Amino acid sequence: MDEAFGFLELVDVQELAGAVEDRWYNQTLCRINDCVVRLGVMQGEFHWHHHDEEDEFFYVVEGRFLIDLQEEGRTVELTPRQGFSVPRGVVHRTRAPERTVILMFESAGVVPTGDGGNELGPARR
């Protein structure tokens, strides 16, 4: 995904998220060294997946965001101004029971479709 913003450009997350009408949206905002910051606007459930080489950090701007951790058998619930990191190799899925805006900080190598091959968007049932 190409970055929407370069260095020395103002990024207004609230304005960007407010313009999103889709139930599932993912945009790379900018690149910082070998990492990217992505904006996610979502409602629904993403499929189970893991990243072999990359860690991820999720930060909630608005809404409610759930991260299910398969091996631990637990769910982490995040509300605005809370964040959580998922280390490489951990099988997880994310859920947003209501419209939720998040920022994701991850390696530029992370494929935002999970393990790859799946469509970007909520899990299919």
Model-derived features: positions:
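A short, N-terminal "cap"/entry segment at the start of jelly-roll beta-barrel domains
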Residues: M1-R38, E119-R125
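Conserved short histidine dyad/triad with adjacent acidic residue
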Residues: D22-R23, V36-D52
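A cytosolic small-molecule/anion-sensing beta-strand core signal
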Residues: N33, V61-E62, T79-P80, E98
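Well-ordered beta-strand positions in beta-sheet-rich domains
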Residues: L39, T75-E77, R93
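Short, conserved beta-strand element in jelly-roll/cupin
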Residues: V41-M42, H51-E71, F105
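Amphipathic, hydrophobic secondary-structure cores in small proteins
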Residues: H47-E53, F58, P80-S85
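Short acidic-glycine-tyrosine-enriched beta hairpin
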Residues: E71-R88
